Amino acid sequence: MEIHPSARKHGIADEDIEHATEHAMAIEGQDDDTRLYLGPSRRADLLEVVTIVRDGGSELAIHAMRMRTKYQRLLPGG
């Protein structure tokens, strides 16, 4: 996964972005070729990561931050 500089805006490390997507607890596909991943950082803080799905299936992370409560409902048991 490639990480766009905009995904670092909130100070989330690249390794945590990758960890959250690789260990996602919820993945929501959007109508505009983006995906929302909700998953843990390496320290178990829940993150929200948005990626753009490219032709060929590769993804570009464009947003990452601590998960907002509005996404709690998407998690198992949420």
Enumerate the predicted regions with their spans.
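Ribonuclease/tRNase effector modules and their secretory precursors
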Residues: 1-78
